[in-house]
Amino acid sequence: MADQLYLSLWYPNFRLESLPAALVGVLRQFALIAKDGQANSALGRVAAASVYPIDWTESPTYQRIYVNDDRAQTSEDTEGSIIENAVAEATEQLHDDMAYEFEMRWMLWLPDVSEGGLDTVWRLEPWRVKITGFGPQFDAGSFEQNGQIRVDFGLDTPWVLEDESLDEDGAERIKHNVEKLLAFTLSVEKHCGISSRLLWTESGEPLAEKLIARLQRLN
């Protein structure tokens, strides 16, 4: 059964004033992996930003959706969706009981279930990721469990399709997805000044070990 996949990040001696810079750092590392060498890719920009007060039951006090298109000329959206600009605008008013959420996209290999025939067709599809920074009082101080910054990868389907359902081509596609996930995780650990991190699932299954074991098998 599909499970929700997260990466929680904790920082040493963290202060609320440090949150915008920490968010920019994580978003930049994600953009580097998502762009995959494409200098002007829209995948390197923020797709949406939201600010939630108190806890997740409240409506956002700020929300902006960006229209990113590499073919479009420079516009208010393309300028605003640059990581530094999007974070600066959303965090202009920093409060310790708010969460600051930024959506980005990366391309992952997914099976196309709509295709007929016996052979599975794999396609690179955009996959949404949410990167959220938490004020220390948001949701009764849930940052202690979620991290000062939490990355929500969505459902774990692109990384944990069962081996028995995969042919050689499918195994290679899943391997690519796993490598991208691990590359981002290691990049954050190396460049973002964190004190600890945890890759976890909503069900509590130890997915990190499962992913590493899968990658070793595919190699």
Q: How would you label these PLM feature ranges?
A:
Residues M1-D167, L199:
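Structured alpha/beta or helical-core interaction and ligand-binding surfaces enriched in interleaved
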Residues F143-N219:
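Acidic, proline/glycine-rich low-complexity IDRs
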